[in-house]
Amino acid sequence: MAERKYFGTDGVRGKVGSYPITPDFVLKLGWAAGKVLATQGTGKVLIGKDTRISGYMLESALEAGLAAAGLSAAFTGPMPTPAIAYLTRTFRSEAGIVISASHNPFYDNGIKFFSAQGTKLPDDVEEAIEAMLEQPMDCVESAKLGRASRINDAAGRYIEFCKSTFPAHLSLDKYKIVVDCANGATYHIAPNVMRELGAEVIEIGTQPDGMNINENCGATDIKALQNQVLETKADIGLAYDGDGDRLIMVDHFGNKVDGDQILFIIAREALRSGNLKGGVVGTLMSNMSLELALKQLGIPFVRANVGDRYVLEKMQEYNWILGGENSGHIIIADKNTTGDGVIASLAVLAAMVQHKLSLNELASAVKLFPQVLINVRFAGGANPLESDAVKAVATEVEKQLAGKGRILLRKSGTEPLIRVMVECEDAELAQLSAEKIAEAVRSN
């Protein structure tokens, strides 16, 4: 695979106003993508965004670039990333484009592409777009320029799709649910889905102003949700991130229920109903307790690299339908082609209603081992993980943990950091072990 200049694991991302998230680059990116995608299909691209103020600027730039290449753009307005994956398929679009930086602050943004099938673009297509970016920009003749249109009922279409994944014989009419939409793309989706299925809904994080996305709310900061669940005596709390592809839950005691526990609940329910189709894909960061709990049920488990892209690739490799990350990306491939926070929450709620059990009771089968994560900054140059001294300390720690835990050492893909993770039933041993390895990395 060729070295990427612009595309990371989740498209093109960065700080707004700094290259490559500038109007001129995004214009060129739209043109390059248009040139590559215009070779076949409908000549139509779907564009959605989250609630960042910069989304207006970037969608205009994308539209101009696509039109210059001869492709038409249809805009959905603020819409969760998984909604764009779904709508790209139903509108038979050539591709879907999401303008979002997911769980990042408002001053970041990004451009992510979906194929006509609603999956991440194949590597060869991304490489072709990168190659086209190196060419001088031109413009098709006037009669062949692309047009722009707006899809006014996009939200309603996606709401109905989400509801269709919830069993028709079940209802949420006995549940009080707090929904935290991170002032992001699910603000007009998730509360309506839950209400239309019968729930009493209390909303937080549903007043986006362009700059408050993910700010002290959502899946990356659940304190406000925990407080609201306890204050209102709600049955459950749901937290999505800025673009709606992550879910973190809170039980009625205010306890966090993370992606590993959510994945287990959905896997166990799929096993009971005969819909599991194979095993479950986690990541290198998935808690060891998830692996052990699945093993007790006889459910196979494999680990992919961190990132929902790699989880999906591993799922496709094994032809399995369920995978996810502890951060809350949950992919249920027989329902949608990417991580979908709203659909994952409905899968857990269905299990609660079906068995008349609380979230706390459902999640209790996975007692998460303490995880200690230390980020060690290094000055660049040689990778400290290649050092014999660091390898020796890591081997020594692994022997001490011997079946009671595990270590994971990896270099960040975006910053000069070594991430040291130690997981163990004994929290004190995990802390000491992580500090020992981190010190070896610093001293290298």
UniProtKB/Swiss-Prot annotation:
Q: Which residues form the active site?
A: 102 (phosphoserine intermediate)
Q: Which enzyme class, named as a word?
A: isomerase
* Entries under InterPro entries matching the protein: A-D-PHexomutase_a/b/a-I, A-D-PHexomutase_a/b/a-I/II/III, A-D-PHexomutase_a/b/a-II, A-D-PHexomutase_a/b/a-III, A-D-PHexomutase_C, A-D-PHexomutase_C_sf, A-D-PHexomutase_CS, Alpha-D-phosphohexomutase_SF
Which N-terminal residues, if any, form the signal peptide? Answer: none
Q: Which reaction does it catalyse?
A: alpha-D-glucosamine 1-phosphate = D-glucosamine 6-phosphate
Positions with a binding annotation for Mg(2+)? 102, 241, 243, 245
Any one of the GO CC terms: cytosol
Might you name a Gene Ontology BP term for this protein?
A: peptidoglycan biosynthetic process
Query: Which Gene3D superfamilies does the UniProt entry name for this protein?
Result: Alpha-D-Glucose-1,6-Bisphosphate, subunit A, domain 3, Alpha-D-phosphohexomutase, C-terminal domain
As for PTM, the annotation reads: Activated by phosphorylation.
Name what cofactor the protein needs.
Answer: Mg(2+)
Keywords noted in UniProt? Isomerase, Magnesium, Metal-binding, Phosphoprotein
State the similarity comment. Belongs to the phosphohexose mutase family.
Q: What does this protein do?
A: Catalyzes the conversion of glucosamine-6-phosphate to glucosamine-1-phosphate.
**PANTHER family given for it?**
PHOSPHOGLUCOMUTASE (ALPHA-D-GLUCOSE-1,6-BISPHOSPHATE-DEPENDENT), PHOSPHOHEXOSE MUTASE
Q: What is this protein called?
A: Phosphoglucosamine mutase
Gene designation per UniProt: glmM
